[in-house]
Amino acid sequence: MSSEILQTGLQLVKSAIDADNQKNYSLACNLYDQAVLNLKLALVAEREPSKNALISSKIEEYSQRNKFIKNLLSQQPQSSQPSQPQQSQFSFPSVPSSISPSINQQQQQQQQQINNNNNSILSSFPSAGNTNNNNNNTSNGFSPPNLNKNEQLSKLNSLSIGNNQSTNRQLSRVEAYEAAKNFSLKGRKEEEVKNYRGASQCYEEACNYYLMAIKSEPDPTLKKNLSDEAKIYLDRIEVLKPFAASQPQPQQPQQPQPQQPQQQQFQQQSYNNNNSTQSMLSSFPSFNGSTNSLNNSLNNSNNNFNQILTNSNMPIAQQNFLQNHQFNQSNNSFNNATSSLPLTFSGDKCAACDALLSTNSIKALDRNWHAECFQVSIICAGCQKPFALSNLSLKVKDNRAYHPMCFESTTGLSQEEIRTFVGSSKQLFFSIQLQRKFYRAGETIQFGFTIDNGTTKKVEKVVAYLLMTETRMEITGTAYERKPKRTIKKLGRCEFHHSNRFPLIKDRFEGDFFYSIPPNILPSEVTGVDASFVREYQLIVKCVGPPLKIMTVKLKFNLTILDK
């Protein structure tokens, strides 16, 4: 089952990457969601640590790519009009309406100095649309300038991207975009409390990471969306400059500095982990590359997944599933599709403690568990003992768990026998119904029995007793052969007869039989890996006739005698 789930997840990943390369981002987004869900289910069932680490890393990679596409898709309809719609998309707090003339003059001098240095930078920063280079700042107020491609790139490169220790390692486009979103959100919070200097610094950091994401993004459409989003914070920096200059310098600017070594250490640790698993990444498709390169990487993989990835076509059942849920029509279609998933899926949380699951979790009773939580929460409904986690095997009946042997002992509680006799067309019917098969020494067994005697044979009484069988494996002979030695004993004989109804001839009788198990008997036992010693019990119930005319109907039940 785990291999089938993993195969479905990998085929969904291939389809998602194909849609991603074809710029069908709506379909790719939903396929990534479905693929991540299947890979998580496969991770729960996978027991090999190396495969668990690989699947976990790929789940994180696909989730980041999916989140990256979702954020950009939400802004794609506004890309044709970069000015007004983008300003309405971000809710910035208002700033004071007037500034001092001295600050305005200082800001104009700084802006003129920056514009003189723009010609020394040679890179490409995509623009959101056509900009009007002839517009100038008004004399009565301050408005953000409209920058062309070179000016936008110049503005981004003029920020402190080279001085930040956390950007020494080149981040991927997804990591850079996530960092940019975090800094932009932090800047908006600083602006809400009117800390314009801190907000400007956060916006500058966000623009740094936007530039890294733009340079690493190969798709022109996504580049354009990133450029539009970065331009919003560039313009906002220009608006906040005079207000940031009017604020006093903070007395302790070293407060955010301890975060930088921690961030650098975390990034270095993530970089080392990526290098350690680089040899296993060939079995999974990546985002950069064409379909041919994906197929080559799949065919050349050295792990056990190469047979799963050879078929690049999506299964017919999966195509019908996608067609029924209309993944191509809306971004919220996957949310509607999840209603058809089993309600027992707990979202990678333990059913007992509701905590996140680790890789060594187990799945039982249609739920996911920590191994320890399952052992203390669920016991066998038959023998009232916990389950062994080394080789977990259980049976479920009426939403209760049983050991396989205990489950077999709960079946066959009803037996019946029909006896015919020579020279008579009538029959003797004898049936017994037990309540259970687990008892302790000294306990009383109550069972109902029915005798329907249509013959002329007499049924004088009903007899019940326990038949104990002990089997020992012994080595005999010169060849050291193992042969069983069996010992059989009859214990606790008990009789039932009704003075007014027995002997029973051409009549029917229904009643209850109460049988007391001897208090000194030993429990059922199986010793040794090869069952070198076995102690078993059978409940024998029979109806008998006159001694001189042998007429016996016997029923046997396998019982389990528990330890006191």
From Swiss-Prot:
Pfam families named in the record: Arrestin_C, LIM, MIT
Keyword Metal-binding included in the entry's annotation: yes
Origin superkingdom: Eukaryota
Disulfide bonds: none
Compositional bias annotation for Pro residues: 250-259
Organism annotation: Dictyostelium discoideum (Social amoeba)
Cross-referenced InterPro entries: Arrestin-like_C (IPR014752), Arrestin_C-like (IPR011022), Ig_E-set (IPR014756), MIT_dom (IPR007330), MIT_dom_sf (IPR036181), Znf_LIM (IPR001781)
Molecular function GO terms recorded: metal ion binding
Ranges for domain LIM zinc-binding: 348-413
Record's protein name: Arrestin domain-containing protein E
Stretches with biased composition (Low complexity): 74-146, 260-269
Region named Disordered: 74-150, 245-286
Compositional bias (Polar residues): 270-285
Record's keyword terms, sorted: LIM domain, Metal-binding, Zinc
SUPFAM superfamilies to which the protein is assigned, alphabetical: E set domains (SSF81296), Glucocorticoid receptor-like (DNA-binding domain) (SSF57716), MIT domain (SSF116846)
Name of the coding gene: adcE
PROSITE patterns xrefs: LIM_DOMAIN_2 (PS50023)
